[in-house]
């Protein structure tokens, strides 16, 4: 393992003329370490396994069936559709919206490289954005959760069988939820960019809704988990507050509309909303790092001089991940994996890799580098770091294990996922009751349904992965793990001539 760590450091510390060979914008020479195109295909396919609602004729994950067809009916609202966020049967609006923002961003930045996978990626975005339109159909209201998490987690059953309460929770002026509402606005705005050319009418509808939802989020301020704590915590509490989502939402609306109103909003409120906070963890809860990268693009690529300070804010985040520089603040395992938290760490690996590649794209366009404590860091070097992280995920690690289900010869077989771990309805038409399913949860048998493309939480700090279904911290997949990975894989597949 020490050797792997040394090789990792060597890869990211090479002079840029050597790093360019590893991760230049131009095509690579020599064999690719992995089949990135195959991984891309599978990373998008995963979303079909997470679908809730009436499945379309084009559904490729055939062992899944219709589910949640009465969602919202208890309050006479149509909330059918969307995605189950992870291995349960819940629709949590906060991580769902973030997943759609990141999946849309993957398409916006790298969709032009996806070729035959582009339509599948668009379909995945649309399945989510259609649901978010339903969740925001009523002014000054966002329906943010379907299902009682405590009751859902007391059962282990297929989504097609679920009989737990499908309680609906919302934010409105009396129960504000700025964080989840602003994230929903960001998702709608980002999705509008995906469909701007292929479906202009749909894109216009998305951006109009994004504007309305953001206005509501900004006007009625409050953290959604304050009032809804018994229902959304400890699952998806908003630990970082709502300031990051307001900045993030404004950034996406500025990018989607080019309306100077949002530019003014960012300029006037950026510091108050934490633009320069040194929080270097980017995920479903804290969006500061993503917002800094996104806003920096307006300066680097679109030459919006008023946002010049965001180049420095973005550089600060990027430099925190560059090993061997005075600004390095990121922990890596001995095998070379970026390690933030033990619970679902792979989400930070994929989101950070995406931001590294995206920022490298912006820097290359503007012919700029990053100064990390006086050390010049090139776009090629950022790409090298990102590629090493993706390679680790795909199997270049001490265990020789791919953490993407269905990719490679060795991958997790006992993932923490109800639908995957229980027989499909086709194989077992009889209902499997709430408590009956727990036999599968604690079984050592491989999941009968392979959830192709699912990326699990990943190994621990010692690069070890037990592959136990009951170990949700390491064995559970989630939409927000896959969403940014889609963009990273598209870039890598293209750079190696696989697309």
UniProtKB/Swiss-Prot annotation:
GO BP: cell wall organization; cellulose catabolic process
Expression by tissue: Expressed in flowers.
Enzyme class, UniProt record, top EC level: hydrolase
InterPro entries: 6-hairpin_glycosidase_sf (IPR008928), 6hp_glycosidase-like_sf (IPR012341), Glyco_hydro_9 (IPR001701), Glyco_hydro_9_His_AS (IPR018221)
Recorded superkingdom: Eukaryota
GO MF annotation terms: cellulase activity
Alphabetized Pfam families for the sequence: Glyco_hydro_9 (PF00759)
Signal peptide: 1-19
Active site residues per record: 88 (nucleophile), 416, 467, 476
SUPFAM superfamilies assigned: Six-hairpin glycosidases
Catalysed reactions, semicolon-separated: Endohydrolysis of (1->4)-beta-D-glucosidic linkages in cellulose, lichenin and cereal beta-D-glucans
Record-level GO cellular component terms: extracellular region
Chief location of this protein within or outside the cell: secreted
EC number per UniProt: 3.2.1.4
Subcellular location field: Secreted
UniProt keywords, alphabetically: Carbohydrate metabolism, Cell wall biogenesis/degradation, Cellulose degradation, Glycosidase, Hydrolase, Polysaccharide degradation, Secreted, Signal
PANTHER family documented for this protein: ENDO-1,4-BETA-GLUCANASE
Family note: Belongs to the glycosyl hydrolase 9 (cellulase E) family.
Name of the molecule in the record: Endoglucanase 3
Lineage, uppermost ranks: Eukaryota, Viridiplantae, Streptophyta, Embryophyta, Tracheophyta
């Amino acid at each position: 393992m020490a050797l792997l760590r040394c090789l990792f450091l060597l890869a990211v510390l090479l002079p840029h003329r050597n790093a360019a060979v590893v991760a230049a914008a131009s095509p690579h020479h020599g064999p690719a370490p992995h089949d990135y195109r195959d991984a891309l295909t599978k990373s998008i396919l995963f979303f079909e396994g997470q679908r809730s609602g009436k499945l379309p004729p084009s559904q490729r994950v055939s062992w899944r069936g219709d589910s949640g067809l009465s969602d919202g009916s208890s309050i006479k609202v149509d909330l059918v559709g969307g995605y189950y966020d992870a291995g349960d049967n819940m629709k949590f609006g906060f991580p769902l919206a973030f997943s759609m923002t990141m999946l849309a961003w993957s398409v916006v930045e790298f969709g032009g490289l996806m070729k035959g996978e582009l339509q599948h990626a668009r379909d995945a975005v649309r399945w989510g954005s259609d649901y978010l339109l339903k969740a925001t159909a009523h002014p000054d209201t966002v329906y943010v959760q379907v299902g009682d998490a405590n009751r859902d987690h007391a059962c282990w059953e297929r989504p097609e069988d679920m009989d737990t309460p499908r309680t609906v929770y919302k934010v409105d002026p009396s129960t504000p939820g700025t964080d989840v509402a602003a994230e929903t606005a960001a998702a709608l705005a980002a999705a509008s960019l995906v469909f701007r050319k292929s479906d202009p009418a749909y894109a216009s509808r998305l951006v109009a809704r994004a504007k309305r939802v953001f206005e509501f989020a900004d006007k009625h301020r409050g953290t959604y988990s304050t009032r809804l704590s018994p229902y959304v915590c400890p699952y998806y509490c908003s630990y970082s507050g709502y300031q990051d989502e307001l900045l993030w939402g404004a950034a996406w609306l500025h990018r989607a509309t080019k309306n100077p109103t949002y530019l003014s909003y960012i300029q006037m409120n950026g510091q108050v909303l934490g633009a320069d906070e040194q929080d270097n963890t980017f995920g479903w809860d804290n969006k500061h790092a993503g917002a800094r990268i996104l806003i920096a693009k307006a300066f680097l690529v679109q030459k919006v001089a008023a946002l010049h300070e965001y180049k420095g804010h973005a550089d600060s985040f990027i430099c925190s991940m560059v090993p061997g520089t005075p600004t390095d603040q990121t922990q890596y395992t001995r095998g070379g994996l970026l390690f933030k938290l033990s619970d679902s760490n792979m989400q930070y690996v994929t989101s950070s890799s995406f931001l590294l590649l995206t920022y490298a794209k912006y820097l290359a366009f503007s012919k700029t580098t990053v100064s990390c404590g006086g050390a010049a860091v090139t776009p090629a070097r950022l790409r090298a770091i990102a590629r090493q992280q993706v390679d680790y995920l795909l199997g270049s690690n001490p265990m020789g294990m791919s953490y993407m289900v269905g990719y490679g010869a060795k991958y997790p077989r006992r993932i923490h996922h109800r639908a995957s771990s229980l027989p499909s309805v086709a194989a077992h038409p009889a209902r499997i009751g709430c408590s009956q399913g727990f036999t599968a949860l604690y079984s050592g048998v491989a999941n009968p349904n392979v959830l192709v493309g699912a990326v699990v939480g990943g190994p621990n700090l010692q690069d070890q992965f037990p592959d136990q279904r009951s170990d949700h911290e390491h064995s559970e997949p989630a939409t927000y793990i896959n969403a940014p990975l889609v963009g990273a894989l598209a870039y890598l597949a293209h750079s190696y001539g696989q697309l």
